[in-house]
Regions:
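Conserved N-terminal beta1-alpha1 strand-loop-helix module at the mouth
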Residues: 1-75, 82-108, 130, 139-141
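Active-site/ligand-binding-proximal alpha/beta "capping" segment
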Residues: 108-149
Length: 149
């Protein structure tokens, strides 16, 4: 299995973020942790055929025309998924139970976080088909390799 590449970009000035995007050769997804210059950043990412993921705000993802949203695990994921329509829903989970519940709610990918993130990702890929990634520690078995810009 070839790992996809999931890029995470911290908040920064518009020029800095756009410069980082310009240097990307290829990636599957781009999560921007900021809230400034979102339309311009989204357009630059999508122009490279990379999925633009909004952090923690489903309504904003819809408004911007993003490709998805990544949210922390919480009750009400089915409602978020229904509101998103075709947009991807990524859910940050730190336990097996959270991940299974997120999968049942329709998550398109699971992002494991916490000190056991890699261990949880290995467990997940052995049992489930929903893609996963490990935010906290690298995991070669996960569907996506995470790189911070």
């Amino acid at each position: 299995m070839k790992q996809g590449l999931f890029l995470i970009c911290p908040t920064g000035s518009k020029a800095d973020v756009l410069n980082k995007i310009a240097q990307i050769d290829s990636a599957d997804a781009f999560l921007y942790e900021g809230s400034n210059a979102l339309p311009e950043i989204k357009n630059a990412v999508q122009a490279k055929s990379i999925a633009f993921i909004v952090e923690n705000d489903a309504a904003l993802a819809l408004k911007l025309g993003a490709d998805g949203v990544q949210v922390p695990y919480a009750k009400g994921l089915k409602n978020i998924k229904a509101a998103l329509g075709d947009l991807a829903l990524g859910v940050v989970c730190s336990t097996r139970d959270e991940a299974m519940r997120a999968g049942e709610a329709g998550a398109d990918y699971i992002a494991f976080n916490g000190e056991k993130a890699a261990e949880l990702a290995v467990w997940w890929i052995e049992l489930f088909t929903v893609p996963c990634l490990s935010l906290a520690t690298p995991c070669e078995q996960a569907d996506f390799k995470v790189a911070r810009l």
